[in-house]
Amino acid sequence: MSGKMTGIVKWFNADKGFGFITPDDGSKDVFVHFSAIQNDGYKSLDEGQKVSFTIESGAKGPAAGNVTSL
């Protein structure tokens, strides 16, 4: 849907496995599911963490995909 974007993790609930990323370009916050995180091992994000991601078409609207830590 679009190229790589960068943003900051607004919040992430590790127990439920999802959260939101605030894009650096000022666009609307993007839903992120743990399955989109490209880390080895435990897939979680920290509040305030800088990440890069793509926008995918999720079941309930736009969602982050290919999420990697910067």
UniProtKB/Swiss-Prot annotation:
Alphabetically ordered keywords of this record: Activator, Cytoplasm, DNA-binding, Stress response, Transcription, Transcription regulation
Keyword Transcription in annotation: yes
Subcellular location: Cytoplasm
SUPFAM superfamilies: Nucleic acid-binding proteins (SSF50249)
GO molecular-function terms, A-Z: DNA binding; nucleic acid binding; RNA binding; single-stranded DNA binding; single-stranded RNA binding; transcription antitermination factor activity, RNA binding
Domain of life: Bacteria
Domain CSD: 7-67
One Gene Ontology biological process: positive regulation of DNA-templated transcription
GO cellular component, one term: cytosol
PANTHER family with a match to the protein in the record: COLD SHOCK DOMAIN CONTAINING PROTEINS
NCBIfam families assigned to the protein according to its UniProt record, in alphabetical order: PRK10354.1
Free-text function comment from the UniProt entry: Binds to and stimulates the transcription of the CCAAT-containing, cold-shock-inducible promoters of the H-NS and GyrA proteins. Also binds to the inverted repeat 5'-ATTGG-3'.
Protein name: Cold shock protein CspA
Protein source organism: Escherichia coli (strain K12)
Gene that this sequence comes from: cspA
